[in-house]
Amino acid sequence: MYVEIVDVRAREVLDSRGNPTVEAEVVLEDGTMGRAIVPSGASTGKFEALEIRDKDKKRYLGKGVLKAVENVNETIAPALIGMNAFDQPLVDKTLIELDGTENKSKLGANAILAVSMAVARAAANYLGLPLYKYLGGVNAKVLPVPLMNVINGGQHADNNLDLQEFMIVPAGFDSFREALRAGAEIFHTLKKILHEAGHVTAVGDEGGFAPNLSSNEEAIKVLIEAIEKAGYKPGEEVFIALDCAASSFYDEEKGVYYVDGEEKSSEVLMGYYEELVAKYPIISIEDPFAEEDWDAFVEFTKRVGNKVQIVGDDLYVTNVKRLSKGIELKATNSILIKLNQIGTVTETLDAVEMAQKNNMTAIISHRSGESEDTFIADLAVATNAGFIKTGSLSRSERTAKYNQLLRIEEELGKVAEFRGLKSFYSIKR
């Protein structure tokens, strides 16, 4: 089937932090349109594809994206008009070649990705198919286990917690709907616990709380308390996941990590994590070490990778070259997938496929600067990834993804699968 792209256009819109981002629209020959908004991260890996910002301090404090919009309207549009909307790999290859840089810094990953996503949406809309079915085919049926970021620290919060995300993982349920309900009930229980203890319960970028607690371990204890008080069983129905984002507390010059006010070597930090894993129902740890500390990842995965999902985010930046190295070294047993780290839909799908073929799990993830766009909800089901990270149970740019997954689960009906603990196929539990 050949359906021509007849128009490609972009505009500057706002993300959930009130910063500009790129929205693209792709129009097909019969008038069908696909639209997409790209997200933006706060803690970014240094190997990520680069978004372009205007750096004009008089507009949006330098964060405008008019240059990226111009790149879509004046460079990308002429190249894609006349192309087949159903040839996503060729569209994305054209975008990559048009840019010509390793990290998409000429046209901007924000310009390229907005168009790549919009093309996929337009093609799905033309066929009258839901996006997950267009991208994933008839076998797209697995609803993801949500990793819900309910306590924020690190670069996502102005508090004294080093680790960036403390998540609840409702994996012990039979449907996505039940898992979501458990997450919401725990979230509200947690709010009550924090409020009664005198903590501020305002929420951060991803909808989680950012209390000043005495240590990272105290944050885990508070989560366990919330799970129990909400009427659920920690370690059976609901588990804990951590995103350490360790690059943010690593001193490159000294080669040490700063955790709980102390200097720690990779080896000492490893011991610290092992103690936490022994004491609490921690099922997943993301970026426990800095993005170039490969040896520590390899050793840690060797030690605890049979019982804990070790996830590479900044380590891999959704890049198949870095992922290949990780697979070869057995550096992790899981990868975090972010569309805007790599910059096209095809490259994202390639990374998921490579991980899954090598018995690694893939977690489809949002960014801290999100929008009402629900592309990643469909992507999680399209790839049967089994996991999604899309924030807490508040802020509508987060709940938009959960609501889309509820719709998809309902639409799939009896075919829908929520694998729960079985989604953790890279570990033996």
Swiss-Prot record:
Keywords: Cytoplasm, Glycolysis, Lyase, Magnesium, Metal-binding, Secreted
GO biological process, one term: glycolytic process
SUPFAM superfamilies given in the database record: Enolase C-terminal domain-like, Enolase N-terminal domain-like
Annotated pathway: Carbohydrate degradation; glycolysis; pyruvate from D-glyceraldehyde 3-phosphate: step 4/5
Family label: Belongs to the enolase family.
Cofactor mode of binding and number, as noted: Binds a second Mg(2+) ion via substrate during catalysis.
Record InterPro entries: Enolase, Enolase-like_C_sf, Enolase-like_N, Enolase_C, Enolase_CS, Enolase_N
Keyword Lyase attributed: yes
Cofactor dependence: Mg(2+)
EC identifiers of the protein: 4.2.1.11
Source taxon at top rank: Bacteria
GO CC, one annotated term: extracellular region
Binding site for (2R)-2-phosphoglycerate: 164, 338, 367-368, 389
Main location: cytoplasm
Residues the entry annotates as binding Mg(2+): 243, 286, 313
Protein name in UniProt: Enolase
GO molecular function: magnesium ion binding; phosphopyruvate hydratase activity
SMART domains, A to Z: Enolase_C (SM01192), Enolase_N (SM01193)
HAMAP family documented for this protein: Enolase
